[in-house]
Amino acid sequence: MPGYPARATSDLKVCIDLIVRPGRHALAPDITEARLERVAGAASGRLGKDTITSPAALRRALRGAQQSVPYPLLVSVNQEGGRLNALDWPQVAQLPANLALGAGRDPEAAELAGSVVAGQLRAAGLTWNLAPVCDLATWPSVPAVGTRSYGSDPKAVAAMAAAYVRGLQGGKVAATAKHFPGLGGITVDPHHDAPVTERLPHGALLPFRAAVEAGVACVMAGSHTVRALDDRPAFASPRVLGLLRDDLGFTGVIVSENLSIPAVHQPLGGLSEAAVAAVAAGVDIVMLDSEISRGHQDFAQRAAGVRRRALVTRALWDAVREHRLSQDRIEEAAARVRALHHAYGLGADAVLPSWEEANAAAEHAARRIADRSVTVVRGRHVLPLSSTEPVLAVRVPDTGERRADSARRAPDHLPGSLARHRLVTSLSPCAAMPPGTGTVVVYGYDTGSAAAAETARWVGAGRVVVQVALGDPDDLAGSSADVLVAAFSPHRSSAESVADLLLGGRAPGPAAVPVGGTAWQ
């Protein structure tokens, strides 16, 4: 397996390790991946949720690992809220998506979101979050962005992103603004294709500037190419990263997009070449896989992760030896990563909050955010629904097309939430229509056009129909429902808020879908 030459300089090895495996180096600087797996359920840059099955188990594993390393432990996680949450065990309270916060138009709520997520993460032993998303939303939505964005208005998104950074880092968890210089305007999913756009949308840099001014610890450089700036992907472009350093004044850690994804590294000739290009351009941490995997990894997958890290490690070493990459650049990057460890890493004497208290605070905040953000797009005058008619709840299956979407596994909370107010009968799409009257609630998460088609069937039968989008509000496009509701999230807090709005007499708030130019507003 490729790796360091036998006579590699130890100082340079340490620097490269910090760039390629910042969390793993702290976890186990001198032991093998196999030993690491036995000690902490971790290998190949991941903490597997097939071996660590609860926040308490994660906390124990990280605490145990910290006892044997000489400096603070730093492990990253994607815990954005909404559809992307690595910590998605059933006992973890989930916050609504960023687009919900944008709909509520309350930066204080975004700061609260950052604060309670920080509490949850620190209670589990994690101190680095790959959030917030600073990309601008577009319509039709981009698969890689969607509800992960705060909206399409640059100033509003900037206010939300800065507030989230203050909340998260005020809770002693490092924030990461992503995906610089902004994914708004791309038309393909960067997990599958190499996105190319001619220019940045107006105001695309404003959210990143606001995050930098708020003191964000890290910025993730995207894998997309903006031709007006450079013909190379952002993470490998000295000009794009220079814009971040020189124009925005960012002095923290620049992280690459996940280079393990073929669509990310193939345009540059492969994984090794992409890693060298990224560090040469100014990246400080080469991201390879996430720190916490979403599912089971077999031996072959773990071994592939080890090989990827070894390839990148050797590629950086060879690039320095061959004078394609300066040792000064390596040492500069390593110094920033060390500073991040000491600013946010988990020390052996760190006092961690109670999981129960942190999670309860997140549950309370989630409901507060949901109540401000659930949006009645059409039919406010119809609400609340009749107090005498029964309710038929029809769930439309999701398309399953979105990658990296933990919300798809969320329990179906809406029928139970509705049943707190009224007798509810659940039906499958295309089921025979029961006789009599009754309001029909057609709902789903990431349904595409299928929910609108199911809605049309019930409208044609003369029923009062409510369509609820539990994910991307694009699902409401073309709907003939009497009432359209954008909830932005399928989690419990949003489902309960929708039920109270439809049946419990809670008046619709001032929220509005924060994406301009949509066909259904």
Set out the residue ranges of the language-model regions:
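Preference for extracellular/luminal or secreted protein segments
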Residues: M1-R38, P267-Q521
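Short glycine-enriched loops at secondary-structure junctions
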Residues: R24-A26, V77-N85, W89, T127-A137, ...
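Catalytic domains of carbohydrate-active enzymes, especially glycoside hydrolases
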Residues: A34-L47, S115-W128
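Substrate-binding cleft of extracellular glycoside hydrolase catalytic domains
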Residues: L74-L87, Q94-A110
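Surface-exposed, active-site-proximal loop segments in enzymatic domains
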Residues: W89-G102, W139-Y150, D189-P195
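A substrate-binding/cap region within the structured catalytic cores of diverse enzymes
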Residues: G102-L126, V133-P154, A161, V165, ...
